[in-house]
């Protein structure tokens, strides 16, 4: 005969005091991030939580664009999550990057396509990968730099999205160097004009309103 179910009263069931808040924060994070595979994302979430690492969580819900309604495409929000997780080091190991990529439920094929733009061995400078990721969100240098500024800025959302000129110039020069049709002298002249602009304001910063470029980078 099967044993009868054991009945417990409320006083006998011990609920860890931190459990409700953990589940509450997890639920909020899942709603904001909208992972394509909740189980896979959850594994990455609790693994990062247990180690005290930055969590794979978006700052806010992103509205899907036309190409993202039926796939797991890369977005600015997901790139920002990766930036929080990887930017503490100058270089990121490709194996670690791939693990974090998978935890965000992004297709590995997309990662490999991005890395093919500037092949490397075992690691890549993080700011360069971020630049490549931003370039994959839009086919123009203007769009890439816009995404770079919005991810790196300390300004509030919807603000001027300013970043240091040195950072802007480094990323711009890197991406423009991947375009064989963009003369180096044109890049240098453009960056010189922006540098003079930032120096005239005495803040050394460049924001979205300071640039507009419409050339393809790949």
Swiss-Prot record:
The keyword Ubl conjugation applies. GO terms for molecular function: identical protein binding. CDD domains: DD_ROP. GO terms for biological process: cilium movement; epithelial cilium movement involved in extracellular fluid movement; flagellated sperm motility; mating; sperm capacitation. Keywords: Cell projection, Cilium, Flagellum, Ubl conjugation. Disruption phenotype: Mutant mice have normal testicular morphology and spermatogenesis but have moderately impaired motility and increased levels of ROPN1. Double knockout animals for ROPN1 and ROPN1L are infertile with normal testicular morphology and spermatogenesis but defects in sperm morphology, thinning and shredding of the principal piece. Sperm is immotile. It is found in: Cell projection, Cilium, Flagellum; Cell projection, Cilium. InterPro entries: ROP_DD. GO terms for cellular component: 9+2 motile cilium; extracellular region; motile cilium; nucleoplasm; radial spoke; sperm flagellum. Sumoylated, sumoylation decreases upon spermatozoa capacitation conditions. Its main location: other. The keyword Metal-binding does not apply. Residues 17-54 form the RIIa domain. Testis-specific. Expression is restricted to germ cells. Belongs to the ropporin family. Functions as part of axonemal radial spoke complexes that play an important part in the motility of sperm and cilia. Important for male fertility. With ROPN1, involved in fibrous sheath integrity and sperm motility, plays a role in PKA-dependent signaling processes required for spermatozoa capacitation. Component of the axonemal radial spoke complex 1 (RS1), at least composed of spoke head proteins RSPH1, RSPH3, RSPH9 and the cilia-specific component RSPH4A or sperm-specific component RSPH6A, spoke stalk proteins RSPH14, DNAJB13, DYDC1, ROPN1L and NME5, and the anchor protein IQUB. May interact with AKAP3. Interacts with FSCB; the interaction increases upon spermatozoa capacitation conditions. Interacts with CFAP61. This is Ropporin-1-like protein. The gene is Ropn1l.
